[in-house]
Every structure is written in structure tokens, then in C-alpha cells.
């Protein structure tokens, strides 16, 4: 008598291990600045095309692998909390840069100049810098609001880069990928290395108060 072949029972439970890694990868791909992704894929791609690729859920895990390195062992990656608690790295840089140049912020008093400055860096960064005047770094005063805004952005990004340089590669890249190519975060100076820890302790404390 011929016995019937056993029926294979398929496991219908989702692969939790895969999901736990694919979700952060998808978020990373979706939040990456388009210039970063275009540089890895094809610099000739239009911004609209890159954004469409980023929105494709099926492609997002593969794009994350491309951005972080194909040779990475994804099953061993520990996705810890985002270093900036999910906040915009440009905003973090502006907050740090405003502390750096807080002495100059106090010198911008005319309504016209103040409006131009706030338009560039935001009212919250302006107030944050003045509030932390005691931690200001720059002694040289900049009176022109446009030049001051540019320098705040430059030194803030450089401090962000210096602060990230001492973090693990995965955590560092998760933040850097959200910035466009070519910011000062990619090449901080020694002066930024020395000040970044103190400034970003204030920035992170501010973020934690905003999103406890």
C-alpha cells in the first residue's frame, strides 16, 4: 500500500528578523538627501527621478544597502536610536552655529538686518544662540546679516561633522546621509573638534526637551 506524500506546512508567520532590519533601512533610504543618492546611482539623474526611487518601498532596502555598503552584514547590525532623535541635521547645525556666533547675534539690532538674519537661520536658532551666549566661541564680530548667516551655517555644520566623527560609522552615516553633499560637516577644522562636544550637548538637550 502506497502511503500519501506528507504535505509540507508553510510557516505563515512574518519574518520578524527581516522586518526589524528592513524597516530602518526603508526609513534611511527615504530620508537620505537626493544629492547623496544621485551620487551613488548616477549624478545625471534628475532630482524628481531620485525622489521617485526613494518613495518606492520595494527599492528602499536595496538603496540603503547601496548607501551604507553592500559588504555590511545586515543581520548583525544594531539599529540604535538616531543620534539627533530624528531631528533635521541642518537645524541641529544652525543651533550649534548660533551658539558659536552668539556674540555677533547680539550686535544685529536693526529690524531690517534682524529680519534678514532670521529668514536665513530661523527664529529658534537666533533665540537659542543668544540664550547660550556664555558658551559662544567666536570672538570676531560679524555685522553683516548675510555673512553672519553663512558663517553660522558653516561653523554649525563643521561642528556637527566633528561631533559625528567620534561616533560609530553606522550612526554617523545615518545623520550625514540626510545632509546634501558639500557641507562643512564633511571637513571640520581642529577648532571644531574641540568645541563640538560642548555645543552639541546643548543641542541634544534642547531636542530632548522638545520631544521627551
UniProtKB/Swiss-Prot annotation:
Record keywords: Nodulation, Plasmid
Role noted for this protein: Regulates cultivar-specific nodulation of soybean.
Protein's recorded name: Nodulation protein NolU
Name of the encoding gene: nolU
Source lineage: Bacteria, Pseudomonadati, Pseudomonadota, Alphaproteobacteria, Hyphomicrobiales
Organism: Rhizobium fredii (Sinorhizobium fredii)
Induction: By flavonoid signal compounds.
Protein origin, superkingdom: Bacteria
Amino acid at each position: 500500500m502506497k502511503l500519501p506524500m506528507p504535505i509540507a506546512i508553510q510557516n505563515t508567520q512574518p519574518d520578524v528578523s527581516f522586518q526589524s532590519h528592513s524597516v530602518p533601512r526603508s526609513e534611511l533610504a527615504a530620508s537620505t538627501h537626493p544629492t547623496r543618492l544621485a551620487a551613488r546611482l548616477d549624478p545625471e539623474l534628475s532630482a524628481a527621478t531620485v525622489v521617485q526611487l526613494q518613495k518606492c518601498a520595494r527599492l528602499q532596502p536595496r538603496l540603503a544597502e547601496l548607501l551604507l555598503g553592500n559588504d555590511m552584514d545586515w543581520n548583525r547590525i544594531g539599529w540604535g536610536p538616531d543620534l539627533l532623535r530624528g531631528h533635521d541635521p541642518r537645524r541641529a547645525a544652525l543651533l550649534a552655529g548660533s551658539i558659536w556666533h552668539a556674540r555677533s547675534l547680539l550686535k544685529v539690532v536693526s529690524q531690517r538686518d534682524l529680519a534678514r538674519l532670521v529668514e536665513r537661520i530661523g527664529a529658534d536658532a537666533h533665540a537659542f544662540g543668544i540664550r547660550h551666549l556664555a558658551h559662544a566661541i567666536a570672538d570676531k564680530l560679524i555685522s553683516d546679516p548675510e555673512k553672519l548667516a553663512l558663517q553660522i551655517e558653516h561653523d554649525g555644520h563643521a561642528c556637527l561633522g566633528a561631533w559625528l566623527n567620534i561616533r560609530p560609522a553606522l550612526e554617523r552615516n545615518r545623520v550625514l546621509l540626510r545632509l546634501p553633499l558639500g557641507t562643512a560637516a564633511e571637513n571640520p577644522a581642529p577648532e571644531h573638534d574641540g568645541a563640538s562636544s560642548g555645543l552639541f550637548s546643548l543641542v541634544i538637550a534642547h531636542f530632548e526637551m522638545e520631544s521627551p
